Amino acid sequence: MKAVITVIGTDQVGIVHRVSELCVKHQLNIEDISQTLMDSYFTMITLVNISQMTGTFSEIVEDFDRLSDELGLTIRVQHEDLFNQMHNV
């Protein structure tokens, strides 16, 4: 099972580090990561394997929501089922 984590906001030191820390905390394996800096805007898309995750998916989303608030960024965690359903419509 996989999930996609997206991060968008004003660039600042430590974004990748903080997102990675939460991935480690919940045993999410980063399989692919892409980041771009456009002027002062930071964007990142991360594909993670959640097969070995600790806790529930809701708890992971809540932790990333807290990080989003703390850093003043938009961070979304979306389960692969969402993307699979979009292709079935």
Can you say where each PLM-predicted feature lies in the sequence?
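A conserved regulatory-domain signal marking ACT and ACT-like small-molecule sensing domains
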Residues: 1-89
